[in-house]
Amino acid sequence: MLKFLITLYLAFFSLSATAADLAREKRLADEIVDMIVEGEPVWLKADNHYFLSIYTPTPQHHPRGAVIILHGRGMHPDWADVAAPLRTALPASGWHTLSIQLPVLEKEAKYNDYVPLFAEAGPRISAAIAYLRDTGVRHIVLVAHSCGAHMAMHWVARHGDRDISAYVGIGMGATDYKQPMKEAFPLAKMHVPVLDIYGSAEYPQVLNMAPERLAAMRKASNPQSRQIVVPGADHYFHEHNGELVKAVAEWLDQLKL
């Protein structure tokens, strides 16, 4: 009996230790929701939890589709680097954007701490897709940065890429010191076009994995897939967000969907 109780306690402790920090997520939402200038807040539901998303429509009369943006580790859908520049700029190229809040942990959490949360992101991605489908969007592109890319790849590995028209991975493969990736990216099995984009001043793990990612994309054999390096950019594209937006927009513009 004692052994059973100890096992039950450890299981509960493990579950609670890896559950998303909903209180911190709420604080992030409270901080930004009234500060949104471009776009509008949309509350989507997944796993009986409402999470913040920011929808920014294109002004063009004939939209090309919509882009779902997944931010990096511990951030929010209007983060100053990567997320906000993409969500506010891509509408000018004919794309609606929907930047969603991903599960977060405390600020000090590392890659290994976030691995159990990858599965929690899946229902949010699916909810975002369902929302866009309900508005009549046909082509949906998933754009994911850093930890968001890990979460996106976890979802693709289990769900497939049938519900998206293309995928953009930004700074893919980032982890922490002596914390190797727990899950391989399913790039070789993807059917949709893939853009792998990263900066030349990236984290070592992202740079070291670049040839492996390119080989996997070539194995998938989609002629529209590309790997692009932004000179001088670090993992967060600080002071290089303009180049990031330009590269992503140009790649999206040439897609034959």
Question: What name fits each language-model region?
Answer:
Residues A20-Q60:
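N-terminal cap/lid segment of alpha/beta-hydrolase-fold proteins
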Residues S14-T18:
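N-terminal signal peptide c-region/cleavage motif recognized by signal peptidases
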Residues V42, N48-L52, P57-R133:
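Serine-hydrolase catalytic machinery in alpha/beta-hydrolase-like enzymes
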Residues N222-L257:
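C-terminal catalytic histidine-bearing segment of alpha/beta-hydrolase fold enzymes
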Residues A166, G171-V229, D234:
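The feature captures the conserved acid-bearing segment of alpha/beta-hydrolase catalytic domains
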Residues Y131-M190:
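Primarily recognizes the serine-hydrolase "nucleophile elbow" in alpha/beta-hydrolase
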Residues P77-W79, K107-K110, M151-M153, D176-P180, ...:
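Extracytoplasmic/secreted cell-surface and envelope-processing proteins
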Residues F4-F13:
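Sec-dependent N-terminal signal peptides
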